Structures are given as structure tokens and as C-alpha cells.
């Protein structure tokens, strides 16, 4: 695509004449990825500034530069106010506006995004849809699975992925949309058909600073939803009727609204809920029909996830009978209330719960399964929201019998300093503090007995631990399995 053609998608009036109109071969934000004919977009990040690498990009073959300030290079420079938003718009245009050729479903919220995204994907596949998925754990294009770095990838990667979905004849894409991606404008060029809200509780205040700012970031998915009206395929917002933030989102969107919930009246509801260690049953009540549901997933939080998925699929036009059949066949997502089974006498559960609300929810579910003592291994991430550390410790102490504080991903912080922040919220309480996460997991499992439950919280599906500037292999489920094997071996030898 010619540079001048590409720049017509920006609202600015770039001064590029016909003699400066190269053919653009790719769009890049990393100078190391630049090749002959690339358009390099200078983005100022947390640790490096792309403007400092403009000359390097030109040396690597960049045909033009997009920047927020003048840079001294011998190729055309287009000045914009916000490079990241320009990057989103340009990427969308360069790849042929691929989301306009998909039914695009965006799911946002503090907790439940990953599970709900996978549930929607499973239901749509049951209905015969060819799906794509973009989420915390991986990206999927039809049957192909690809790794990811962020919950919501950078806009260039995002639009390139959507273009691949077009090429692979994907008709519906489901994606997790993080608050960071919304506030940074990564999804600015995405044409969503359905936007879904799970819940809003404390998280990411290291970035958003206040809950109002965090809520505003989430609201951008809904305020942008009505931007491209189509009477044949109206935009739809799916909101949690039991979360007070939904009232705010309802005000900012022009889309048709569907609701789901347990406590308050909604379009999709669960009634007569029964939860056991073996699974959950409830009456699914919708304007499309009522059905008694029995599923293997455990916990009220999973009921909410299912309701969100059902409401989403109804909004997507999937028949109610197919939806209910698929719901009863749903299986858990790795690292989300994942049972580790090595023939031990007590349940060991790995869960991604890393916010106060999600930890409280999963501990309450575990308590219902516990005849003896409830153990929880929990830590808090370094270089992240410090205000939730004492809150999570307090929840662990109040809801578990054997709380064990440990490291999560300490990153650049001293693990013991993080533990001290946690301990500040539970002075004079009973708890264990073991900085080494592997040792903490082994300690919990070695001390658990029949009738007890061990919850390992915080990292879920992650297969690494970040300590300082290094990243080490670390998988909670794998470590737990080794601890159980050692426990069983010791019992056999004793």
C-alpha cells in the first residue's frame, strides 16, 4: 500500500508529496523488525523510547517514520499527537480492516475474562462456527495455536492476527480486552460486534491509580461500540446485572444491552444453584427458554462465567438448544480451579486468583469442599499494585485455616519486602511466611491430610517465575504434582 493512501486513514493532514510516496511493505514499532519498505512508528514505552531508534530503523530499511516529535532522518516523517493510536489505525488499514470481515466479540473485566472467552469459543464451535481466540494463555486461529506476550497484543500483532483469521476463513473471533489495551489505544481499530463485561474489582491500580480511572478504561470498550451502526447486525453490550459498574457502562454505550446475573433481574439468570465438589447445577432462565443445567465446573464464579457466555452466544444468534448442550459439556481452563491429581487423599487446586475479589471467591468455593483444614499458598506480584497486598493477606487469613504467604513474580522487588507488605494487613494473625514459592507449595502439601484442601493461588496457567531480571521455568501444577509424589513416597517408606 502506498504511504499517501495509508495516511488517509489518519485524521491529521500529513505533508507528504508524490515524490515521497513509497510502497509500504510492513508496519513496525520495533526497529529490529524493520525491513526494506517498512513504516516505523516511534512509540515511547515504559523503559525505551522508539524516537531514539528512528535512525536505526532507517538504516534497516524504513521508508517512512511516524512520530510524536521531529526526528533527524532522511525519509518522510509524519507527526501525530499519539503514536499508539496512530499505530492502531494504520495497522487496521494496512491489513485491510480485517475485523469488519469477522463477528468480533470483546470480553473485559477484572476476573473471568479467560474462562468466559474459552466458554464462548466452545459454544460457538458446537454451533459449527470456525473461531479465532485471543487471550491471556494463547492465540488460536482455527485449529492453529500461537503463543502470546500480553493479554491483548500490540495493535500491529493484533491486526496481523485478524488478517490471518480472514485468510483461514474464521467467521467469529473472541478476545480478552485488557484495561491497559483500552487505555493505550491498542484496540482502537477493532470493529466489535459484541462487548461483554464480567466484573470490576480492584486490580492494576499501579497503572490506573484509582478505581474511577480503571472503570473508565473498561468503559472505552462500550463507548466505542456504537461507532459503526449497522441495522442488519446491531452492536450489543452484555453486562453483569449484579455488578454496580454496569450502570456506568450502560450510560456510555449506544448499543443494545443484554444482561445476566444471579441476584438481580436479568435477561439470563441462574436460579436454584447447587454447588458440590463434583460440579454445579442450576436452572438457566432466559427469554429464549429455561433449562436445568448440570456441569462439572465448580463454584459460583463459574456460574457467572457461564451466564456471561450464554448471554453472549444468545446475542450472537446461537440457538438456545445448542447453547445448553455445549454448557453441560464445558471443561475447565488450565490454571482456573485446576485439580492436580496424583492419587493423593485431598484435593490440590491451582487457580489464577490474583486479586482480592478473585481470591475471596475461590477460597469460599474451596471452603464448601473442605471437611478439615483449608490451606492457601498465596503471594503478590512485584512492581504491581501494592495496595492490594495487605487486602489479599487479610482475605487469606480470614478464609483459610493455614495461610501461607510466598512469592508470586517478585520482578525487581525484594520478595521479603513484598511479604512484609502482605503481613502489614494481618498483624497478630496466624500465618506462615515462606519466600521460596516451591518450598511453600511443598510445605502446604506435606502438612495436608485427608479431608483438607490445598489451594495454590496467583499464577494459574503461568509456566514461569520472574525474579529480578531473570525468568525461570515454574509451573504451580507441576511443582504441586512433584510435592504430592514425594508425599506419597514418604508415606510408602514410613
Swiss-Prot record:
<dbReference type="Pfam" id="PF02875">
    <property type="entry name" value="Mur_ligase_C"/>
</dbReference>
<dbReference type="InterPro" id="IPR035911">
    <property type="entry name" value="MurE/MurF_N"/>
</dbReference>
<keyword id="KW-0131">Cell cycle</keyword>
<feature type="short sequence motif" description="Meso-diaminopimelate recognition motif">
    <location>
        <begin position="408"/>
        <end position="411"/>
    </location>
</feature>
<keyword id="KW-0132">Cell division</keyword>
<dbReference type="InterPro" id="IPR013221">
    <property type="entry name" value="Mur_ligase_cen"/>
</dbReference>
<dbReference type="GO" id="GO:0071555">
    <property type="term" value="P:cell wall organization"/>
</dbReference>
<dbReference type="InterPro" id="IPR036615">
    <property type="entry name" value="Mur_ligase_C_dom_sf"/>
</dbReference>
<keyword id="KW-0573">Peptidoglycan synthesis</keyword>
<dbReference type="GO" id="GO:0008360">
    <property type="term" value="P:regulation of cell shape"/>
</dbReference>
<feature type="binding site">
    <location>
        <begin position="109"/>
        <end position="115"/>
    </location>
    <ligand>
        <name>ATP</name>
    </ligand>
</feature>
<dbReference type="InterPro" id="IPR005761">
    <property type="entry name" value="UDP-N-AcMur-Glu-dNH2Pim_ligase"/>
</dbReference>
<feature type="binding site">
    <location>
        <position position="458"/>
    </location>
    <ligand>
        <name>meso-2,6-diaminopimelate</name>
    </ligand>
</feature>
<dbReference type="GO" id="GO:0005737">
    <property type="term" value="C:cytoplasm"/>
</dbReference>
<dbReference type="Pfam" id="PF08245">
    <property type="entry name" value="Mur_ligase_M"/>
</dbReference>
<feature type="binding site">
    <location>
        <position position="150"/>
    </location>
    <ligand>
        <name>UDP-N-acetyl-alpha-D-muramoyl-L-alanyl-D-glutamate</name>
    </ligand>
</feature>
<keyword id="KW-0963">Cytoplasm</keyword>
<feature type="binding site">
    <location>
        <begin position="151"/>
        <end position="152"/>
    </location>
    <ligand>
        <name>UDP-N-acetyl-alpha-D-muramoyl-L-alanyl-D-glutamate</name>
    </ligand>
</feature>
<feature type="modified residue" description="N6-carboxylysine">
    <location>
        <position position="218"/>
    </location>
</feature>
<feature type="binding site">
    <location>
        <begin position="408"/>
        <end position="411"/>
    </location>
    <ligand>
        <name>meso-2,6-diaminopimelate</name>
    </ligand>
</feature>
<comment type="function">
    <text>Catalyzes the addition of meso-diaminopimelic acid to the nucleotide precursor UDP-N-acetylmuramoyl-L-alanyl-D-glutamate (UMAG) in the biosynthesis of bacterial cell-wall peptidoglycan.</text>
</comment>
<keyword id="KW-0436">Ligase</keyword>
<comment type="pathway">
    <text>Cell wall biogenesis; peptidoglycan biosynthesis.</text>
</comment>
<keyword id="KW-0961">Cell wall biogenesis/degradation</keyword>
<dbReference type="InterPro" id="IPR004101">
    <property type="entry name" value="Mur_ligase_C"/>
</dbReference>
<keyword id="KW-0547">Nucleotide-binding</keyword>
<dbReference type="InterPro" id="IPR000713">
    <property type="entry name" value="Mur_ligase_N"/>
</dbReference>
<dbReference type="GO" id="GO:0008765">
    <property type="term" value="F:UDP-N-acetylmuramoylalanyl-D-glutamate-2,6-diaminopimelate ligase activity"/>
</dbReference>
<dbReference type="GO" id="GO:0000287">
    <property type="term" value="F:magnesium ion binding"/>
</dbReference>
<protein>
    <recommendedName>
        <fullName>UDP-N-acetylmuramoyl-L-alanyl-D-glutamate--2,6-diaminopimelate ligase</fullName>
        <ecNumber>6.3.2.13</ecNumber>
    </recommendedName>
</protein>
<dbReference type="InterPro" id="IPR036565">
    <property type="entry name" value="Mur-like_cat_sf"/>
</dbReference>
<feature type="binding site">
    <location>
        <position position="462"/>
    </location>
    <ligand>
        <name>meso-2,6-diaminopimelate</name>
    </ligand>
</feature>
<comment type="similarity">
    <text>Belongs to the MurCDEF family. MurE subfamily.</text>
</comment>
<feature type="binding site">
    <location>
        <position position="178"/>
    </location>
    <ligand>
        <name>UDP-N-acetyl-alpha-D-muramoyl-L-alanyl-D-glutamate</name>
    </ligand>
</feature>
<dbReference type="GO" id="GO:0051301">
    <property type="term" value="P:cell division"/>
</dbReference>
<feature type="binding site">
    <location>
        <position position="31"/>
    </location>
    <ligand>
        <name>UDP-N-acetyl-alpha-D-muramoyl-L-alanyl-D-glutamate</name>
    </ligand>
</feature>
<dbReference type="Pfam" id="PF01225">
    <property type="entry name" value="Mur_ligase"/>
</dbReference>
<feature type="binding site">
    <location>
        <position position="384"/>
    </location>
    <ligand>
        <name>meso-2,6-diaminopimelate</name>
    </ligand>
</feature>
<dbReference type="GO" id="GO:0005524">
    <property type="term" value="F:ATP binding"/>
</dbReference>
<keyword id="KW-0133">Cell shape</keyword>
<keyword id="KW-0460">Magnesium</keyword>
<dbReference type="GO" id="GO:0009252">
    <property type="term" value="P:peptidoglycan biosynthetic process"/>
</dbReference>
Amino acid at each position: 500500500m502506498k504511504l499517501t493512501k495509508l495516511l488517509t486513514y489518519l485524521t491529521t493532514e500529513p505533508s507528504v508529496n508524490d515524490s515521497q510516496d513509497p510502497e509500504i511493505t510492513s508496519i513496525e514499532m520495533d526497529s529490529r523488525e524493520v525491513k526494506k519498505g517498512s513504516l516505523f512508528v516511534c512509540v515511547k514505552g515504559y523503559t525505551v523510547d522508539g524516537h531514539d531508534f528512528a535512525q536505526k530503523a532507517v538504516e534497516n530499511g524504513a521508508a517512512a517514520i511516524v512520530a510524536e516529535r521531529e526526528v533527524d532522518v532522511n525519509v518522510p516523517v509524519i507527526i501525530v499527537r499519539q503514536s499508539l493510536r496512530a499505530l492502531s489505525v494504520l495497522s487496521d488499514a494496512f491489513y485491510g480492516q480485517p475485523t469488519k470481515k469477522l463477528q468480533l466479540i470483546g470480553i473485559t473485566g477484572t476476573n473471568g475474562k479467560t474462562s468466559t472467552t474459552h466458554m464462548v469459543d466452545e459454544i460457538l464451535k458446537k454451533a459449527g462456527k470456525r473461531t479465532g481466540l485471543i487471550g491471556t494463555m494463547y492465540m488460536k486461529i482455527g485449529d492453529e495455536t500461537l503463543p502470546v506476550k500480553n493479554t491483548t497484543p500490540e495493535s500491529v500483532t493484533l491486526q496481523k492476527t485478524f488478517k490471518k483469521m480472514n485468510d483461514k476463513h474464521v467467521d467469529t473471533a473472541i478476545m480478552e480486552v485488557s484495561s491497559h489495551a483500552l487505555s493505550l489505544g491498542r484496540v482502537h481499530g477493532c470493529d466489535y460486534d459484541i462487548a461483554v463485561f464480567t466484573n470490576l474489582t480492584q486490580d492494576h491500580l499501579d497503572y490506573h491509580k484509582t478505581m474511577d480511572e480503571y472503570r473508565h478504561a473498561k468503559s472505552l470498550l462500550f463507548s466505542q461500540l456504537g461507532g459503526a451502526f449497522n441495522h442488519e447486525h446491531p452492536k450489543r453490550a452484555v453486562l453483569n446485572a449484579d455488578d454496580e459498574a454496569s450502570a456506568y457502562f450502560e450510560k456510555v454505550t449506544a448499543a443494545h444491552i443484554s444482561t445476566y446475573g444471579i441476584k438481580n433481574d436479568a435477561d439470563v439468570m441462574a436460579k436454584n444453584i447447587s454447588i458440590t465438589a463434583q460440579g454445579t447445577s442450576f436452572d438457566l432462565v432466559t427469554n429464549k427458554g429455561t433449562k436445568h443445567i448440570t456441569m462439572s465446573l465448580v463454584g459460583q464464579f463459574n456460574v457467572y462465567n457461564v451466564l456471561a457466555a450464554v448471554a453472549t452466544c444468545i446475542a450472537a444468534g446461537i440457538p438456545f438448544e445448542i447453547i445448553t448442550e455445549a454448557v453441560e459439556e464445558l471443561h475447565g481452563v488450565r490454571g482456573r480451579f485446576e485439580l492436580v491429581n496424583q492419587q493423593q487423599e485431598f484435593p490440590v487446586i491451582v487457580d489464577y486468583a490474583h486479586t482480592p475479589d478473585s481470591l475471596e471467591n475461590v477460597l469460599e468455593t474451596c471452603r464448601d469442599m473442605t471437611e478439615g483444614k483449608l490451606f492457601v499458598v498465596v503471594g503478590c506480584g512485584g512492581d504491581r499494585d501494592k495496595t492490594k497486598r495487605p487486602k489479599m493477606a487479610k482475605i487469606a487469613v480470614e478464609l483459610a485455616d493455614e495461610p501461607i504467604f510466598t512469592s508470586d513474580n517478585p520482578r525487581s522487588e525484594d520478595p521479603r519486602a513484598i511479604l512484609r507488605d502482605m503481613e502489614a494487613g494481618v498483624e497478630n494473625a496466624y500465618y506462615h511466611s515462606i519466600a521460596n514459592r516451591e518450598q511453600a507449595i511443598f510445605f502446604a502439601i506435606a502438612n495436608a491430610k485427608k479431608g483438607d484442601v490445598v489451594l495454590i493461588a496467583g499464577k494459574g496457567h503461568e509456566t514461569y517465575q520472574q525474579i529480578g531480571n531473570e525468568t525461570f521455568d515454574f509451573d504451580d501444577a507441576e511443582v504441586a504434582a512433584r510435592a504430592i509424589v514425594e508425599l506419597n513416597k514418604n508415606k510408602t517408606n514410613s
